[in-house]
Regions:
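Short beta->alpha hinge that forms the Motif I/post-I loop of the SAM-binding pocket
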Residues: 34, 69, 93-95
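Internal alpha-helical scaffold of NAD(P)-dependent oxidoreductase catalytic cores
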Residues: 129-180
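NAD(P)+-binding Rossmann beta1-loop-alpha1 motif at the extreme N-terminus of oxidoreductases
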Residues: 1-59
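Rossmann-like NAD(P)-binding element
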Residues: 55-89
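Phosphate-coordination loops involved in phosphoryl transfer and adenosine-cofactor binding
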Residues: 2-5, 87, 134
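Rossmann-like NAD(P)(H) cofactor-binding subdomain of soluble oxidoreductases
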Residues: 76-126
Length: 180
């Protein structure tokens, strides 16, 4: 990942784990979070090289942008942040895909995804560079196949296995499995 400038919006369990693993793999990582405590903890832990004051500033500084915000904040960001067309790749990690794909329809190099990994606790304090090791990471087919291929390579570098699945099918499977 050397030479990659990864922006991570949302420095909780998933975003923090992405940041930790990417830094360990040699990427430069810039973070944004509305909680200064999360940014301070991530910086102190060596997960971040720098921070950004907002999502627009983050998108302007990175080559790859991971949106690791809650679903409602992800949808709002996708619909209202024109700078998301600047990075070479933008991806999300929300647990629902169809609404995200719809909200991101104007973002050229966007790929919807969902790592099937987590913990009972959230927040940066629960983040772990090995969280995705051996786990499946769902990837919705993207209009930009080069962006999709790039995300699939990144997922492998984060330790996970990409699985391409249509957004609607992903949502149906997650809904069924959440009741088990």
């Amino acid at each position: 990942m050397k030479g990659t400038v990864l922006g991570v919006a949302g420095i909780g369990l998933i975003g923090g784990s992405i940041a930790l693993r990417a830094r360990a793999n040699g990427a430069t990582v810039i973070g944004f979070d509305r909680d200064p405590g999360a940014l301070n903890a991530a910086t102190a832990a060596g997960a971040l090289d720098a921070t950004a004051p907002d999502l627009t500033a983050l998108a302007e500084r990175c080559t790859i942008l991971a949106i690791a915000l809650p679903v409602d904040a992800t949808l709002a960001a996708l619909a209202s942040t024109p700078a998301l067309n600047l990075p070479e790749l933008v991806f999300d990690v929300a647990s629902v895909k169809a609404p995200v794909v719809h909200a991101a329809r104007t973002i050229e190099r966007f790929v919807a995804s969902h790592p099937l990994a987590g913990r009972e606790r959230g927040g940066f304090g629960a983040a772990d560079a090995a969280l995705f090791e051996g786990r499946t990471w769902a990837v919705a087919p993207a209009r930009d196949r080069a962006a999709q291929a790039r995300l699939e390579r990144l997922i492998g570098e984060l330790g996970a296995r990409p699985l391409v699945v249509a957004a609607d099918e992903h949502d149906r499977l997650v809904a069924v499995s959440s009741h088990l």
